[in-house]
Design a protein with these regions (language model features):
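N-terminal glycine-/serine-/threonine-rich beta1-alpha1-beta2 phosphate-ribose binding loop
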Residues: 1-34
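Short glycine-/small-residue-rich Rossmann-like dinucleotide-binding loops
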Residues: 14, 20-21, 44, 150-152
Length: 211
């Protein structure tokens, strides 16, 4: 079926897997809520208002939303939260990500997901701790903050590294994607998982039983 009528395309569908753009994903979320179709969202780059709109649609239908659908990244996310909760503020948290030259959002959705996990480990929200840009900043690093750095080049699928650094030691954990197949496989797993679930906003940690 080839059509520009989204509701028609959803007739008989059990789930939609959506890797698109924020505005398109919002239209899809609205249509899924109206047709009781589960919605798996791999799109990144949403602003706060768009995030809130998605949460509203999740009151009516199952939405699985994740900045990264891969098994490895979500296991890493779980580890980041645990490590963050175990370490005190003497350990500075930095997140470095690299993607292909054409990626438009920075930091990546995955980097923000890792940042959110680190913030949860401290009992805070990422908005309270995030430092996204240091260009021109002359002051020292604020204790407890979470820093981000983004690299773009070539055809890199995705690399993410989270470091916890004190005056005397450093813990670093890294994930590197070799193929985009990992995102497809995770999205299919999420769609199958969503079939028996009540309406709500979920993520891959729910799908993989990591929380």
């Amino acid at each position: 079926l080839i059509t520009d009528d989204l509701k028609l395309a959803l007739e008989g569908a059990e789930a939609v897997i959506d890797f698109s753009m924020p505005d398109t994903s919002l239209e899809c979320a609205k249509a899924c809520a109206q047709t009781d179709t589960a919605h798996v969202i791999g799109t990144t780059g949403f602003n706060l208002g768009q995030e809130n709109e998605i949460a509203e649609y999740a009151n009516k239908v199952v939405i699985v939303k994740a900045g990264n659908m891969s098994l490895g990244i979500n296991v890493l996310t779980s580890f980041v939260e645990k490590i963050s909760s175990s370490l005190d503020l003497d350990f500075d948290i930095e997140i470095l990500e690299m993607h292909h030259r054409d990626k438009v959002d920075a930091p990546s959705g995955t980097a923000l997901m890792l940042g959110e996990a680190a913030a949860r480990g401290k009992g805070k929200s990422l908005s309270e701790l995030r430092v996204a840009l240091r260009d021109g900043i002359s002051a020292g690093r604020e204790k407890g903050s979470i820093g981000f750095a983004s690299l773009r080049g070539g055809g890199v699928v995705g690399e993410h590294e989270v470091s916890f650094t004190s005056d005397s030691e450093r813990i670093s954990i890294k994930h590197e994607a070799f193929s985009r197949d990992i995102f497809v496989n995770g999205a299919i797993k999420a769609a199958l998982w969503s079939k028996e679930k009540d309406p709500g906003l979920y993520d891959m940690l729910n799908v993989l039983n990591l929380r």
